[in-house]
Amino acid sequence: DVYKRQEKELPYFAATLTAYLRESHPELLSDKHFIAERSDHAAQTYERAVRNGNSVYEALELSNAVLYQDLRFSKYDAIFEVVSEWFPEIVARQRTAFCLKLLPVCEEAFEMYDLTDDFESSPSYKNLLLELTGLIQTHIERHGIQ
């Protein structure tokens, strides 16, 4: 029965999305509406693809495109990369909280770029990392690492 199958698929997509958000977009983790809506859309895409004769692999590929749309590039991951590489004084156990605190601080750098899903592979990505390094250094000089 299609309805029962979709009921089972929704928790899979919600769990998958939640795990991804925890790693790359922790600022979105509390947005239960977003998670439910995106997961539901992915489950519907999967169900529709299977019903239309696509293989399970193809259906998962289509549903993952929906699930991760506009989430491939992560501001948090970019900040985390800079902090991990250039600021060893931020110990591993403090990095997540520190990087979350830096999201609003670094927003001015992010606004200068077109942050598409494939931005990380663009030449501009290195420029962004340089901008972030400067902003983070200035923030630490003014406010410390608390």
Regions found by a protein language model. Give the residues of each.
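Short, small-residue-biased leader/transition segments that mark boundaries at the very start
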Residues: D1-Y3
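N-terminal interaction modules that seed assembly of large macromolecular complexes
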Residues: L10-V66
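Contiguous interface-forming segments/domains that mediate binding rather than catalysis
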Residues: T16-A19, P26, F34, I90-R95, ...
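Long, charge-patterned amphipathic interaction tracts in eukaryotic proteins
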Residues: D70-L115
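Long, low-complexity acidic/proline-rich regions
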Residues: T96-Q146
